[in-house]
């Protein structure tokens, strides 16, 4: 007999179809607890209460049998999800302890850290067939270590996007903290999911496509194989001080003010805190441009010359609709923007400057690339989003909606409030958060949730996935070394 509430199958939105049906986030939340066993009942009951009130989390992604288009997927009840062990499992790892993140102020420490780093990612993630379709929506594994708990969540990206994953962690914290008192809160969250999905579906059916706009039936040649797990990559976390990033942003904005004087002195835009969001750039834009430029430089191959490099930046569209979508909508509300760089533009990086210094040409190029990133993001507004949804609705094959990643992909989870969450008296707050790179994509960069280092100084942390030789070259890259504080391999826990 099924222990969970049943739900009616529902068709995934066109936003959801930007991702494959079996592509997962793996988020590892670490809790430092003196008696880890005491936390198991709290986590188990919270997870089961959450999926009980949000039953689509117990479901699976599969083909929509009555769809009039090709490639349409839906979330449906799963015959394999019948009891709590199919949703959340507990595993004991008594010989292992929580990872200790290197202190940025003491140099990279990469060699020492790497020497004790053990590849344990396969042991902590929930076990199921990641390549199967139908594909589970959500699974959890509670890993009990000698000095704490690592809760690993597997979340299907076709159902829940990055912002939604952060919201789901927030929901779980509330349920851990409030217990039975969270039921009404969960039911409100469930109602929000249903109403927002309907709203997005309705937008797609409203009105005709504007003249000259074609439906989304362009093929996505080879997009699927980019998302396949199992390839051997180096996954490092790069750490930058917030002060250095802000200083770099200031230099870029000064250059852009000279290049676009009319824009930088124009009337304030009420929708942004800067004068012109197309011309003045944020810290996030500058860091995105730095990663794009540096990775493009280290991956250039004279034997296989290419003319250009592209960067994909997924944009959270919740606040770009009018009216806005709810912050705690879990489903995909992402539009992937693209900017391009002619590789000939990188030639200026070899022309001047010394090791440890940023060249004039390098900063100028960085400013231009940050401006391109900002311009592509600024173009995402209510009107363009509604046209995008209508284009998708008119497409005859929804497999063509699958996003094709650029040469570099930079996603930002910095808005997550993970380190400010309270999971209740037993668990407390999160000691560490890692993104387990089981589904790593070469060239992917994920800006991690905002936090401070051990001294209380603000930092930016970015998980980067590259081939080992390119990762080494990136760490030695001239411009990167000017702002990189430290780096270390991704590690969730280690031998005690």
Curated annotation (Swiss-Prot):
GO BP: alkaloid metabolic process
Gene3D superfamilies referenced in this protein's UniProt entry, alphabetically: Chloramphenicol acetyltransferase-like domain
Catalytic activity: campesine A + acetyl-CoA = campesine C + CoA
Source species, domain of life: Eukaryota
Pathway(s) served: Alkaloid biosynthesis
Record-stated family: Belongs to the fumigaclavine B O-acetyltransferase family.
Function: O-acetyltransferase; part of the gene cluster that mediates the biosynthesis of campesine G, a dimeric indole piperazine alkaloid that shows good insecticidal activity Galleria mellonella. Within the pathway, cpsE acetylates N13 of campesine A to produce campesine C. CpsE produces an inseparable mixture of two acyl-atropisomers due to the spontaneous rotation of an acyl group at N13 of piperazine ring. The non-canonical non-ribosomal peptide synthetase cpsA catalyzes the first steps of the pathway by producing L-tryptophanal and L-valinal from their respective amino-acids.
Protein name from the UniProt record: O-acetyltransferase cpsE
Species of origin: Aspergillus campestris (strain IBT 28561)
